[in-house]
UniProtKB/Swiss-Prot annotation:
Name recorded for this polypeptide: Cobalt-precorrin-5B C(1)-methyltransferase
Domain of life per record: Bacteria
GO molecular function list: cobalt-precorrin-5B C1-methyltransferase activity
Species for this entry: Geotalea daltonii (strain DSM 22248 / JCM 15807 / FRC-32) (Geobacter daltonii)
Similarity remark: Belongs to the CbiD family.
């Protein structure tokens, strides 16, 4: 399947808004329906199929099954349920729409996110979408009394264990997310959105130094070396994955003053070669670049033949016996690359060994 034919899907926020509209229409008309259409923030009119409909005197609920298209999304196939309950409004008050979470929706426990601490993890755009569709349904009669809207995901707590929610301080379930309502297939947006949120949380929690890791192994090494829980708080550790350039530029934009880049040799070599995105198949070119660095230095010229014959960066490192000059040559170039993107920050590099030891820090 080529990228051109990959199918887009819909966010949890769009699904929640569609389910809310379905429940509202059933309440208004007193009959079960199977389908609704909503207008997404970008103006697209999209149909959604409803499931598990229930209708009572002052209660209605239904679900939408999330279709993430061809995006490998953890929440693809999840049931997004919305229940609406009408209650008498206090005397002298107007109709109100109160949006809250239920089973499988997380609560925010750390500052820095779009939702305040203590609130359900239903982001502002989905909240607005839900209120808009309910107001549309009751446009003629006006919203009756107090309308309580509860969003839930039956297996949300279990699914959340496969996400970074807990790290961001979202506990007990998933988030209801989305700004456009549309999930782009195989896009980096979900990851870069998480990087944005993680940096915001870290700064809001008072972290002065942020540790950006290329993967979980290097992050674990950094946590031990930097004494997680003693010298460094957990919010400071941010998994940037392959999005090195994006993470560094975001740190620069948000005024981060001290950064540690943690990674293993192969990933750090890509960064040293100037790759802002390290998910690239350029091992041969990276090794050629490494050779050009090693040759002029008499301390590493003996490694040139090894680097030319090697198939991988890891092979060069291991067969060099973790040569300290080799490691410094790469790590110093990582610092130089980062300094060009984050000019006002202090940069350090932590090289994690393949045996989960620290090979270089400085």
């Amino acid at each position: 399947m080529t990228r051109a034919f990959l199918r887009s899907g819909y966010t949890t926020g769009a699904c929640a808004a569609a389910a809310a509209k379905g429940a509202a229409e059933m309440l208004r008309d007193g009959q079960v329906i199977d389908r609704v259409e909503i207008i997404l923030p970008g103006g697209e009119l999209v149909p959604f199929t409803l499931r598990n409909q229930q209708l009572g005197d002052k209660f209605a609920s239904c679900s939408v099954i999330k279709d993430a298209g061809d995006d490998p999304d953890i929440t693809n196939g999840a049931e997004i349920n919305v229940s609406l309950t009408i209650e008498p409004a206090p005397p002298g008050t107007k109709g109100e729409i109160a949006v809250s979470g239920g089973t499988g929706i997380g609560k925010v426990t750390k500052p820095g996110l779009a939702v305040p601490v203590g609130e359900w993890a239903i982001n502002p755009v989905p909240r607005k979408m839900i209120r808009v569709v309910i107001n549309e349904v009751f446009a003629i009669r006006c919203v009756p009394s107090l309308m309580k809207v509860t969003v839930s995901i039956p297996n949300g707590e279990e699914l959340a264990k496969k996400t970074l929610n807990a790290r961001l301080g979202i506990i007990g379930g998933l988030s209801i997310l989305g700004t456009t309502g549309i999930v782009k297939p195989i896009s980096a947006k979900a990851w870069t959105d998480t990087i944005d949120a993680a940096i915001d949380v870290a700064l809001a929690c008072g972290s002065k130094t942020l540790i950006l890791s290329t993967g979980r192994t290097s992050e674990l090494v950094a946590e031990r070396h930097l004494q997680l829980g003693k010298l460094t708080q957990e919010e400071a550790f941010i998994m940037m994955g392959d999005h090195v350039g994006y993470a560094l530029k975001t740190c620069a934009a948000k005024g981060v003053r001290e950064i540690v880049i943690a990674g293993q040799f192969a990933k750090l070599l890509k960064v040293a070669c100037g790759h802002e995105q390290t998910h690239v198949s350029s091992s041969e070119l990276d090794l050629q670049q490494l050779v050009s660095w090693l040759g002029p230095d008499p301390r590493t010229s003996g490694l040139v033949l090894l680097a030319r014959r090697a198939n991988t960066a890891r092979q060069v490192l291991e067969e060099s016996g973790n040569d300290p000059v080799l490691m410094a040559a790469v790590c110093e170039r990582v610092k130089g690359f980062a300094a060009r993107l984050v000019q006002e920050s202090s940069i350090k590099v932590l090289l994690a060994g393949y045996g989960q030891e620290v090979l270089y820090f400085g």
